Amino acid sequence: MKYKTTSVSIIYINEDMINQRIDNFLQKKLKNVPRSMIYRIIRTGKIRINKKRIKPDYKLKIGDKLRIPPIKILCEKKSSLLTTEYKKNLLNNILYEDNYLLIINKPSGIAVHGGSGINLGVIEYFRKIRPLEKFLELVHRIDRDTSGVLMLAKKRRSLLSLHKQIREKKVQKKYIALVHGLWPLSLRKVSEPLLKTHLKNKQRKILINKEGKPAETYFKIKKQYLFTTLVSITPKTGRTHQIRVHTLHAGHPILFDKRYGKRDLDCNIKNKTKINRLLLHATSINFIHPETGKKMHIVAPLDVYFKNYLNTLI
């Protein structure tokens, strides 16, 4: 492993940085520095604000002068994701952009952020390609294998406003999925608590468990095929892998779901297009614009692979 030592950096806190705890701010800023080291350099007084020592829970104020000392960090590996094709794939999928928001139609197979062996995700990519953006954060997340609407905030106050809307359930997201079998007309809601677990291989998996958090998902049949059903889905809660686990619980897993699907069922499906992606797509999002107060409705079209697969079905 290769390491490098950073130089001293001075940051003047602006309105997009205020009201954050210093430990959380540094964790975002110092990507390859362990959280334990961040706490250590705060506790030992190496991090200074306005030339004074601070505690990890100190909240940043506008005009604060933050001094970050030289820090030994792990060098980033060069990522194969920064290719022309990757760049084109993301930039051509921008659905909406203004001074406050960036909304894209995320392709399947691209993570929203780095981690777990992934060097770059959507957020890291846009930060690299747009270094002049002072602030850029994910408003919400969608699974790596799910395609569709993804919102990023370009101002901290926009992020906080949208997070408030999400907490108050004022943001509505809709999905479509192709599931195995004929979905019953009477099955319009699945309401089962979800619990995060970790398997022996450290992989995270979500299970239905009474000790878990409440989760509620609504379903509506869009079209039935011979062996599959296209369903419209509205999650009322935003739990990790909620839709994938609730469809499995209903006995109708999503096609080509490698974690929660049924491999034998996937193998039995005639796959003329050789598609191998999770057939789950975030089709639209409704929210109030954080600056203008305007009602927003953003729609993400299906990608060509999902669309072509549907065209092969009878």
Swiss-Prot record:
Lineage top rank: taxon: Bacteria
Active-site residues annotated for this sequence: 143
Q: Which GO terms describe its molecular function?
A: 23S rRNA pseudouridine(955/2504/2580) synthase activity; RNA binding
| The protein's Enzyme Commission number | 5.4.99.24
> GO terms for biological process?
enzyme-directed rRNA pseudouridine synthesis
Catalytic EC class: isomerase
Query: What NCBIfam families would the database entry show?
Result: PRK11025.1, rluA_subfam
- Similarity comment: family membership: Belongs to the pseudouridine synthase RluA family.
Q: What is this protein called?
A: Ribosomal large subunit pseudouridine synthase C
